[in-house]
Amino acid sequence: MVNKSQVLLDIANKKAIKVISGLTNLNYEHVLTIARASQRACVSYIDIAADPQLVKVVKANVNIPICVSGLEIQPIYNAVLAGADLIEVGNYESLYKRNTVLSVCKIITLVEEIKKLCPRVPLTVTIPYILNQKDQINLCKQLESLRVDYIQTEGNSISKCKNHCVQDLLRLSLQTLACTYELVKHTQLPIICSSGLSDVTVPLAFSLGASGIGIGKFVTSYYEEEKIVSILSKIKKIVSGTRSYQACE
């Protein structure tokens, strides 16, 4: 049986690792490959599309907590009925591509509705990087009062990185790292730093106060299970080393 409380424990211990399969990725075989690799590497949980059938397929094949992300109530609720263990209000890319921003008010309304429907399911909310700093902080304060379990930062994940050179890896993660740095000073909620992270920038996320990290395209651009396991195992060692270093300070 999946122990979703372990996810919250990993977050509390500042060692959470989330693997994002691609929130529009409905290639079942690819998602299963990522899920199997994630389980073998002992990451905290995986984040998949809010598709009930996909949730059922993954649940039938691996024993790892599943988070579903979205911006619509019904798909999220259906995914929970199918077995999803956690919920994330997020996946704003489709809005950004249309030059649209979800307002703080609409995010709060969505959170309230989800908490009414799924009061016992751990809930996280991604803070839109496109909001100004004042609105981001205001959103965090309201989410605290609504007792969401934790929040997530993001950046411009539309950017590409072809060569995985250090400069590009730093550039891709700059926005989410900056958001983490600012928000950790203004909220008591644990923060998952996500979007554009890599083995180079994961230590930076924890040094800035993150309680966990989200890894997406850095691993999910691969289709070979062994390759994904290798990368995630390296990330796991980095996270463990980062925590040991912080404990010695």
Curated annotation (Swiss-Prot):
Keyword Chloroplast tagged: yes
Protein name: Uncharacterized protein ycf23
Main location: plastid
Family from the record: Belongs to the ycf23 family.
InterPro entries in UniProt: Aldolase_TIM (IPR013785), Uncharacterised_Ycf23 (IPR007570)
Localization: Plastid, Chloroplast
GO CC terms in record: chloroplast
Name of the gene: ycf23
Alphabetical keyword list: Chloroplast, Plastid
Lineage, top ranks: Eukaryota, Rhodophyta, Bangiophyceae, Cyanidiales, Cyanidiaceae
